[in-house]
């Protein structure tokens, strides 16, 4: 009783699957020569072994022909015919062969099958069939219902849908599907392109990946040379570059691997062709997918965070330190969201090999995965990023127009806005092209697949599409454009860090010099004192400019210089005296007789007051060094004791020579 129940459930499930994917079926006369002399003459297709017609069933029975011709068992031919061309008892009802019939055929022909190298298929295991009292359906049952009635057509032309060829079938444990059919995988090489086209595309992707890898690696190394140079709001550019550096690295690895990871090897002995790798059973393919998908999504999220930091700096006027306090939240979002999506795809077993680029990704053959895990995140990032970017640029432009700034700050602000605009365009244009390619691919995927089935149905011995109205093949340029724009997206980061300062940093790095701490020009625009006051002040409050001790023409004023000199502490005055002494000693030249003379005598004479040259006698020249040391020592003590001493103007050389002439 239990065996009958299991058999009934098995047949019901198979019929339910057929009714969901195909049209209604009908009884049809048996055309197989091997099954012509049986007590029944009509069968039901498709059968229990997923053969959609009798021609396909005949091809599947060919390996058993030697055993049937040698008559290893008189029950083998009835058993095969009952399984491959089952008797049609009623419309939509099939009768399974009995277990005893299967066991006798297997026991008597097993050794001969081993000799011919013919395996006993798993779907023909005797335990799957019911334990009948009679090994075969009774003739009475066959004669009553074997002839087709007027209500049941003998055969109709109908749409069978896609049936997976034997060459493309895979292990059921892999839980993969192709064109809606389980345990089936797409063929390798690619379904739509020739081998020479695939070879050209692979080299094209390899060259572009090297260019992108070089650009993003240069950006990252520039950041490592001077970590303090790139702070918020522009720090996300570095992480954005790191993401696309990893993306380009994975594509370069795929170029080196060719299709060794993206495709499963062929097995001619089991009639298995090379198929696309699907699922997480291939560890190398899984690793390539995880890194590629994770960093692709993380790169787009970091671009959104970059627009957020620009928005915070331009609209609410946040400073670099305030934005940097949110760095933990930025990192949690940029790495957490892609990580969650990657884990979900791993759990759903949506990994697919790409036999064009040699990597593994998602949505290459599954339109639903492409729509929800690739297109949706990218479109959301573009909408949010563009909105924040436009808001920030509009705010900065309003500052430039409404608030009066110095010409230098105006130029810096305009330059900063231009850099933001150019960088955003260089990112958005390739990304929008990639999204457009994905939308086009999603819209025409069904037409391409139908065309492929139409062209290969006779080769694979599967049913051809019924009433095909549109056929089309994809152009290789579409896929090349998609891969090109996907990699070019990472190159704009090098334009942001590319400047004269970067060249100086690399030159200093190669020469082993330590670079002085500086402020990046793009960040300095938002931190300029006058510019920051203009951003943070009340629009109705007038701007009060404070003097820094120098005029706009760059000339020193007497009042400001004197005031700054009077406010210096004693330590700075002592250092000033030391600098005077060292300056004078540096300007003296020692002659052969041991005397020290000024190096530029003519220049000193021109700078001295009228009549002062007459006091520079030979005696004063001999003792100038001695008096200089004594007067410098006395002057330094006198200066330290009187903090409000008068500071004379002129160069240190003039002051020292004037004092020497007076004492003489």
Swiss-Prot record:
Residues 226-236, 309-327, 395-419, 498-664 are cytoplasmic. Glycans are attached at residues 41, 355. Residues 22-135 form the FZ domain. Expression restricted to the early nervous system. Receptor for Wnt proteins. Most of frizzled receptors are coupled to the beta-catenin canonical signaling pathway, which leads to the activation of disheveled proteins, inhibition of GSK-3 kinase, nuclear accumulation of beta-catenin and activation of Wnt target genes. A second signaling pathway involving PKC and calcium fluxes has been seen for some family members, but it is not yet clear if it represents a distinct pathway or if it can be integrated in the canonical pathway, as PKC seems to be required for Wnt-mediated inactivation of GSK-3 kinase. Residues 549-564, 573-585 have a biased composition (Polar residues). SUPFAM superfamilies: Frizzled cysteine-rich domain. The keyword Glycoprotein applies. This is Frizzled-3. It holds the Pfam family Fz. A motif (Lys-Thr-X-X-X-Trp motif, mediates interaction with the PDZ domain of Dvl family members) lies at residues 501-506. Belongs to the G-protein coupled receptor Fz/Smo family. Changing residue 501 to M: Complete loss of activity to induce the Wnt target gene Siamois expression. It is found in: Membrane; Cell membrane; Cell surface; Apical cell membrane. Residues 537-664 are annotated as: Disordered. InterPro entries: Frizzled/SFRP, Frizzled/Smoothened_7TM, Frizzled_dom, Frizzled_dom_sf, FZ3_CRD, GPCR_2-like_7TM. Residues 1-16 form the signal peptide. Disulfide bonds join 27-88, 35-81, 72-109, 98-132, 102-126. Its main location: membrane. Keywords: Cell membrane, Developmental protein, Disulfide bond, G-protein coupled receptor, Glycoprotein, Membrane, Neurogenesis, Receptor, Signal, Transducer, Transmembrane, Transmembrane helix, Wnt signaling pathway.
């Amino acid at each position: 009783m239990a065996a009958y129940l299991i058999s009934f459930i098995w047949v019901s499930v198979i019929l339910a699957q057929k009714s969901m994917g195909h049209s209604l079926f009908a009884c049809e006369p048996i055309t197989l020569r091997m099954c012509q002399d049986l007590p029944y003459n009509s069968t039901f297709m498709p059968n229990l072994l997923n053969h959609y017609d009798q021609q396909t069933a005949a091809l599947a029975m060919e390996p058993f022909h030697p055993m049937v011709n040698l008559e290893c068992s008189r029950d083998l031919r009835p058993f095969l015919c009952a399984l491959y061309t089952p008797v049609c008892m009623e419309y939509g009802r099939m009768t399974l062969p009995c277990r005893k019939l299967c066991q006798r055929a297997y026991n008597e022909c097993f050794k001969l099958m081993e000799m011919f190298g013919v395996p006993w298929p798993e779907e023909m295991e005797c335990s799957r069939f019911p334990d009948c009292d009679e090994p075969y359906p009774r003739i009475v049952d066959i004669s009553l219902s074997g002839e087709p009635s007027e209500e049941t057509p003998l055969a109709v032309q109908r749409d069978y849908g896609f049936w997976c060829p034997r060459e493309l079938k895979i292990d059921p444990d892999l839980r993969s599907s192709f064109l809606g059919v389980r345990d089936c995988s797409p063929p390798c090489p690619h379904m739509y392109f020739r081998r020479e086209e695939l070879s050209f595309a692979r080299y094209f992707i390899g060259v572009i990946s090297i260019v992108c890898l070089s650009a993003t690696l240069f950006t990252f190394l520039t950041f490592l040379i001077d970590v303090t140079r790139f702070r918020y709001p522009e720090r996300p550019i570095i992480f954005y570059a790191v993401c696309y550096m990893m993306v380009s690295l994975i594509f370069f690895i795929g170029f080196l691997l060719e299709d060794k990871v993206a495709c499963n090897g062929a097995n001619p002995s089991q009639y298995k062709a090379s198929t696309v790798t699907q699922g997480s059973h291939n560890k190398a393919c899984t690793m390539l997918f995880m890194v590629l998908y994770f960093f692709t999504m993380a790169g787009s999220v970091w671009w959104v965070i970059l627009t957020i930091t620009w928005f915070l700096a331009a609209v609410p006027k946040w400073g670099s330190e305030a934005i940097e306090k949110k760095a933990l939240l930025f990192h949690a979002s940029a790495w957490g969201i892609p990580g969650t999506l990657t884990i979900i795809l791993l759990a759903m077993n949506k990994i697919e090999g790409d036999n064009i680029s040699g990597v593994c990704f998602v949505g290459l053959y599954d339109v639903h995965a492409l729509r929800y895990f690739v297109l949706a995140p990218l479109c959301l990032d573009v909408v949010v990023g563009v909105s924040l970017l436009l808001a920030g640029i509009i705010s900065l432009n309003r500052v430039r127009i409404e608030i009066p700034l110095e010409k230098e700050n105006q130029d810096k602000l305009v330059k900063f806005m231009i850099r933001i605009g150019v960088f955003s365009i260089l990112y958005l244009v390739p990304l929008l092209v990639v999204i457009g390619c994905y939308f086009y691919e999603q819209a025409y995927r069904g037409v391409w697949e139908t065309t492929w089935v139409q062209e290969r149905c006779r080769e694979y011995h599967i049913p051809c599409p019924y009433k095909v109205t549109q056929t089309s093949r994809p152009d290789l340029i579409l896929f090349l454009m998609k891969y090109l724009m996907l990699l070019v997206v990472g190159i704009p980061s090098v334009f942001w860090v590319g400047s004269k300062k970067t060249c100086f940093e690399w030159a200093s790095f190669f020469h082993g010099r330590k670079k002085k701490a500086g402020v990046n020009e793009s960040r300095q625009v938002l931190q300029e004192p006058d510019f920051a006051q203009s951003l943070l002040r009340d629009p109705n409050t007038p701007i009060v400019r404070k003097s820094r001790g120098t005029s706009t023409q760059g000339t020193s004023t007497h009042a400001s210089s004197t005031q700054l000199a009077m406010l210096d502490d004693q330590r700075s005055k002592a250092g000033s005296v030391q600098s005077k002494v060292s300056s004078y000693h540096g300007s003296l030249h020692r002659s052969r007789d041991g005397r020290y003379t000024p190096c530029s005598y003519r220049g000193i004479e021109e700078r001295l007051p009228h009549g002062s040259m007459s006091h520079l006698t030979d005696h004063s020249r001999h003792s100038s060094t001695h008096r200089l040391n004594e007067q410098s020592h006395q002057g330094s003590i006198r200066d330290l004791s009187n903090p409000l001493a008068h500071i004379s103007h002129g160069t240190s050389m003039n002051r020292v020579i004037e004092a020497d002439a007076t004492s003489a």
